[in-house]
Amino acid sequence: NPYCLPPTDFMSGNKPITKKIKEIEKIAKSGLIPVTYGDALWFGQNKTYILSGDKIMTHIAKILKPRLCIFALNEDGLYSDLKSKKLIYELQGERPSISENKMDVTGGMTRKVEEASKIAKMGMNVFFVNGNKPERIVKAVKNRTFEGTLFRGKKNV
């Protein structure tokens, strides 16, 4: 069962609230599936900012250090070529081909790649999979061959 968590539940300004992030782990261990999302948040003195779901993933990964992180996309993963949709199965320094969506104020695919790279540098594997094909998420979680892109976790790189 999904359990919706607005970012205001675990963010104060632009900083994560560690104690509240740790509660997300308790929610997950209880059998519920924590679901959060990016949003416009209050920053004080009549200022707001956009917090992307991708940035939230980095905050959660840094505090909870999960075994892996999965970004569910509307695509199969990252492509080396957008026209042929040639999938990059493991990102190893090559530059993926990314089309920019000017309507995406959260940073789009470029932000996803940046945040996934940060998480991988913390030592966790990160998977980009097509969220419209849930069996791919299951395969990634079970460490089976899956269709998508892997950012291999690297410690102290």
State each model region's role.
Residues 1-157:
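C-terminal catalytic "cap/lid" subdomain
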